[in-house]
């Protein structure tokens, strides 16, 4: 009988722990709702504009990362006629 009592207690403890964990997890969802405060909207717009300017400063186009199989198709300089020459190297 001692074995079944401890098994029942551990199941109850496990269920209680699960319920407490779910309650704590569900209580965090209340903070995720958006606010209709105009200052928070203005702050979000300002942060997005700042992010856009930082991205524009640090993002670089990917020139020179493609092969020379078809330079006209990749926007390479068409004046380079020697791209097909086997001795041509960059």
Curated annotation (Swiss-Prot):
Propeptide: 67-90
Ranges of compositional bias, category Basic residues: 56-65
Chief location bin: secreted
Protein name: Neuropeptide F
Gene: npf
Modified residues (Phenylalanine amide): 63
Record family assignment: Belongs to the NPY family.
Record's function text: An integral part of the sensory system that mediates food signaling, providing the neural basis for the regulation of food response; coordinates larval foraging and social behavior changes during development. May have a hormonal role in females.
């Amino acid at each position: 009988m001692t074995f079944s009592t401890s098994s029942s207690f551990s199941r109850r403890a496990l269920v209680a722990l699960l319920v407490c964990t779910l309650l704590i997890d569900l209580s965090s969802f209340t903070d995720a709702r958006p606010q209709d405060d105009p200052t928070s909207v203005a702050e979000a717009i300002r942060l997005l504009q700042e992010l856009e300017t930082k991205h524009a400063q640090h993002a670089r186009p990917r020139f020179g990362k493609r092969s020379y199989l078809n330079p006209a198709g990749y926007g390479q300089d068409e004046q380079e006629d020697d791209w097909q020459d086997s001795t041509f190297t960059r």
